[in-house]
Amino acid sequence: MLKYLLFDLDNTLYSRHYGLENNVSRRIFEFASALLGIPPEEVRRQRMEARKQYGTCLEWLMTEEGFTDVEAYFAAVHPPGEADALVPDTELRAFLAGIPVPKAVLTNAPREHADLVLDKLGISDLFTHIIDVRQCNFFGKPRREFFEYALRTLGVNIDEVLFVDDHPFYVEGFLALGGKGILLDEDNFHSDYTQPKIRELKEITRYIG
């Protein structure tokens, strides 16, 4: 029995075409470039090599480079006004409100970013929990620890949750634990993906029984 819908935040609850996530990625690489003294392109290369070991750039920097000033990182990556392009989404609100299943957000971003985005979209009150990367010692998706923390927080078993994310790597991490996960692939970038996939959020109703 489905007891919870667990949503990623960025590029899942709003379209990737707003460009917010691209700007976040750019600021991450710029921050790491300044920190390490190497070009952003080299940061990107090293980060991609370490992607399977570290789900987030922050975890990579903390583990491999001994980085500790987490709040400086978040301040640089998530500046004021970063979500100004977003507007209240009344259609999304009506859709989510019409699903009679509790909903939560699981994000690799800090809580203040999640609050900002959800407030801009006008859907903050529709989620019982916002589970952010700070709550699990900065271990993010697809780390087992983060998923298990989310399940404990929600008080459910993994087979009672449907997880939706726009990153195959993160969905596959949830699937590997025995969960049910759906990839939101808005522009069909992952045409060879063999697990359940949707192009827009409204299609999740096919998987809610």
Predicted regions and their residues:
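N-terminal helical cap/lid subdomain that shapes the substrate entry/recognition surface
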Residues: 1-90, 112
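Asp-based, Mg2+/Mn2+-dependent phosphohydrolase catalytic module
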Residues: 1-3, 97, 104, 110-111, ...
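Alpha-helix boundary/capping residues
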Residues: 50, 77-80, 99, 121, ...
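Catalytic-core regions built around general acid/base machinery
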Residues: 91-100
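Residue-level marker of regulatory loop/turn positions in helix-turn-helix DNA-binding domains and
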Residues: 84, 88, 106, 139
